[in-house]
Amino acid sequence: MLIKAYSSSANLGAGFDILALAHNAFEDSVEMEAIPNSTLQVLVTGDGVPNEVDKNSASYAVYRLLSELDVKVKVKMKVIKGIPAGLGLGSSGASAVAAVVGVNNLLKLGLDKQELVRASMIGEIASSGSAHPDNVAASVYGGVVAVLNTEPVTVSPIPVNLNFSLLLFIPVLQLKDKTKKAREMLPRNVELGKMVRNSRYLSSTILGLVKGDRELLRLGLNDEIVEVARSPLFPHYEKLKKISIENNAIGACVSGAGPTIAVFVDEYSDKNKIKKEGLEICETYSQKCLVKEAKIAGGAWVERWN
């Protein structure tokens, strides 16, 4: 069986660990087979991915799920990475989702989407040390999602009534353990005023998407807490956001923990100028970037049954 899952951008401004959006910039694939066995055994291979079960988000998610269900089977999987790792594009989450969706279909486990998210988010422990649900929720459901609770996992799709695409400014680099380090940068305490303003931003983002109001979405794509705390990871961000809005982008935000920047554009935006001036800004920070245009995408799917 071959299963695929799309890349994603989480947070979307003030929606830390709440909002995420699946997009078709990249996709991860997992080839999988299940063989009857007297014990549970999970084997994982793939170019450039850990082959230790507890260090690979895909294999760890599957192992924990089948252990919990007391399923005795030998699962062999090959992870084919299409999503760049460590750049804020939901790479580890997509692999975990593809693997969990695969084993759910192969073994006819009957998991619904909420349960798929819960199982997949466990895989994030292998890559970042914490079971955060936002990226995996986007890769399971597709579209834009809101994580409403984690115990129990509760996810709600957000209706999108605005036609836009993303320009992803993706630094060409490799960052080891980036998500874990980025989480360590977060403040332990937050000033009340900043919390209130962030709540307003989050409300504006959701309302802008649902109502199809680009000005509300522009207002919402801001964050005074998480993006500020992590700003050393993406020094090019503020200037890139500024020139994007000057060229009539809807707005911009850090994609997940960065350093990728997501610029929201539509028919009123000067995409060519945003690309040109954005790349120039990246270069002023000695940062080579590539620009990838992407649209909102669907959830994980089975590409092929063997």
Curated annotation (Swiss-Prot):
Task: List, alphabetically, the PROSITE patterns matched.
Answer: GHMP_KINASES_ATP
What reaction is this protein's catalytic activity? L-homoserine + ATP = O-phospho-L-homoserine + ADP + H(+)
Task: State the superkingdom.
Answer: Archaea
- UniProt enzyme class: transferase
**Keywords from the named record:** Amino-acid biosynthesis, ATP-binding, Cytoplasm, Kinase, Nucleotide-binding, Threonine biosynthesis, Transferase
Query: Could you tell me which PANTHER family the record lists for this protein?
Result: HOMOSERINE KINASE (PTHR20861:SF1), HOMOSERINE/4-DIPHOSPHOCYTIDYL-2-C-METHYL-D-ERYTHRITOL KINASE (PTHR20861)
- Give the protein name, as stated in the record: Homoserine kinase
Q: What is the lineage of its organism?
A: Archaea, Thermoproteota, Thermoprotei, Sulfolobales, Sulfolobaceae
